[in-house]
Structure formats: structure tokens, C-alpha cells
Regions:
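Hydrophobic alpha-helical membrane-interfacial segments at the cytosolic entry of transmembrane helices
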Residues: 2-17
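Hydrophobic alpha-helical segments
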Residues: 3-7, 124-218
Length: 218
């Protein structure tokens, strides 16, 4: 098993490195094994690139009467998502890369990617997001410090909950922790976004209902 992982990992990385070019119908610019492998590894380390481009294009981000990237996914879900549409809100016409999402949404990833990549963004490319830049854009350095501190407190609290026997709290902690480690390359609210969706709570209610029914039968 260890041998398979040792041998298979470079091969998989090589295949994914080639796939980066093939999916865009672009000729592979590197022909050597090590060149393709190093090119793949380099393209995975784009976290700093998001920070650098975020600072560079910060003043060029679309300005609206109300704009908040930190809680963007949650706000867009309530205002222009499936839940917002139920209460009469106008849902976004597009769910993938588009000028609409790049200008009107509260998604930092869409807003910044359109500024940086322009036409390439409309073809489906993107540079992602970073919770640090979202906090900085919305609240400045003070916001980065305070909310990062709160994240640390939340992380400790969830670890404590994980050792208790409360099933629901334990499940919620696992759900948040699943995305928390990707936050440097993702949105601030992405980790707990599912907690605000109807789909998530619908599944939770179904599980609770079925569990109670099975308990009664036993």
C-alpha cells in the first residue's frame, strides 16, 4: 500500500499537470517529467498570488451601495439565492462565471477574478479568494485581527465540543472544520455557509425524524 502511494502520487500529479493544459486545448509548454511535475506544484501555490492581486486591485473592485465580501455567500443566498427567490427576491441569472456575478455579487472570488483575468474569467477560469483579503477589504487591518482572533476562539470551542456526547453539536463542528482549513484560499463564511441553507436543515430534520421512528420501534 505504501509502495502504491509512493509510486502513484507522482504519476497522478503528472497526469493532473498535463490536464491543466489539455482542458483548455493549450499545447503543453513543458515536455520533461520534472518540468511538468514542478509546474503542477507551482500552480498549486497561488495563495500569495491572491493576496498580492487583492492589494493591487483593491481600489478597482466594483462599488455598490452595500457590499460585503466577508459574509458574501450567506448574504447572496438570502438576497438573491434560492431562499431569496422564495420571498420575492431576484435570483442571479447565472450560477457560473459571468459579468453579473463579477459585478453584482458579494463573492470576492468572482469580483477579483474578473478584474485580473477578464476574458479568461468568462471562459471559466478564476484565482479563488482569501479570507484575509475579504476581511481587509471590508474592515481593514483591525477587522483582520479581530475576526482572526474570533476564528481561533471558535476553533478551540469546536475541539472541545468534539469530545462531548452531543451528536448535533459534534456534527456541526465536523461540518465547519471540514472547510476551515481551506479558508486561506476560500471565503471567510464558506466554512459555516451550509448552516444557513434550507437543504442542510432539511436533511438534519429528516435524520432526526427517522432516528426517533427507529427508536420507537425498538
Amino acid at each position: 500500500e505504501k509502495l502504491a502511494i509512493f509510486v502513484g502520487s507522482p504519476i497522478l500529479m503528472l497526469a493532473m499537470g498535463v490536464l491543466n493544459y489539455v482542458r483548455d486545448n493549450v499545447q503543453v509548454s513543458h515536455t520533461g517529467f520534472w518540468d511538468i511535475l514542478l509546474d503542477f506544484i507551482y500552480k498549486q501555490g497561488t495563495s500569495f498570488g491572491v493576496l498580492a492581486r487583492g492589494f493591487l486591485f483593491n481600489s478597482s473592485l466594483p462599488y455598490r451601495d452595500f457590499r460585503n465580501f466577508t459574509f458574501g455567500p450567506v448574504l447572496d443566498y438570502f438576497a438573491r439565492g434560492s431562499l431569496g427567490a422564495i420571498f420575492g427576491g431576484k435570483a442571479f441569472e447565472h450560477t457560473t462565471n459571468s459579468v453579473e456575478l463579477a459585478i453584482d455579487s458579494n463573492s470576492y472570488a468572482h469580483n477579483l477574478s474578473y478584474l485580473v483575468l477578464n476574458k479568461e474569467y468568462l471562459k471559466g477560469h478564476g484565482i479563488g479568494s482569501s479570507y484575509i483579503m475579504e476581511l481587509y477589504t471590508d474592515y481593514g487591518m483591525i477587522g483582520v485581527f479581530l475576526l482572526s482572533f474570533l476564528l481561533g476562539v471558535l476553533f478551540i470551542a469546536m475541539l472541545q465540543v468534539a469530545y462531548r456526547s452531543r451528536t448535533i453539536l459534534f456534527a456541526l463542528s465536523l461540518l465547519i472544520l471540514n472547510n476551515l482549513f481551506f479558508m486561506p484560499r476560500s471565503s471567510f463564511s464558506e466554512s459555516f455557509f451550509n448552516l444557513f441553507t434550507m437543504q442542510f436543515w432539511g436533511i438534519v430534520l429528516v435524520i432526526i425524524f427517522v432516528a426517533k421512528m427507529l427508536t420507537k420501534e425498538n
